Amino acid sequence: SAEETPLQSKVTNKVYFDISIGNPVGKVVIGLFGDDVPQTAENFR
């Protein structure tokens, strides 16, 4: 089995979206690595 490498990057921001299928069913939260990919993280803000 392969060993997992711990993350070295820091989540700088979180974005989320709520999911509804007729009624609210949940929320998806995505962590953004702004120090590693600042332009990509900014696109979500």
Curated annotation (Swiss-Prot):
SUPFAM superfamilies the UniProt entry points to: Cyclophilin-like
InterPro entries: Cyclophilin-like_dom_sf (IPR029000)
Localization: Plastid, Chloroplast thylakoid lumen
Coiled coil: none
Residue span, PPIase cyclophilin-type domain: 11-45
Domain of life: Eukaryota
Gene Ontology molecular-function annotations: peptidyl-prolyl cis-trans isomerase activity
Enzyme Commission (EC) number: 5.2.1.8
Keyword 4Fe-4S: no
One GO cellular component term noted in the UniProt record for this chain: chloroplast thylakoid lumen
Keyword rRNA-binding: no
Key words, A-Z: Chloroplast, Isomerase, Plastid, Rotamase, Thylakoid
Catalytic activity: [protein]-peptidylproline (omega=180) = [protein]-peptidylproline (omega=0)
Gene3D superfamilies: Cyclophilin-like (2.40.100.10)
Anything else known: Was originally reported as TL18.
Family, per entry: Belongs to the cyclophilin-type PPIase family.
Function statement: PPIases accelerate the folding of proteins. It catalyzes the cis-trans isomerization of proline imidic peptide bonds in oligopeptides.
Protein name (Swiss-Prot/TrEMBL): Peptidyl-prolyl cis-trans isomerase TLP20, chloroplastic
Organism: Spinacia oleracea (Spinach)
Lineage: Eukaryota, Viridiplantae, Streptophyta, Embryophyta, Tracheophyta
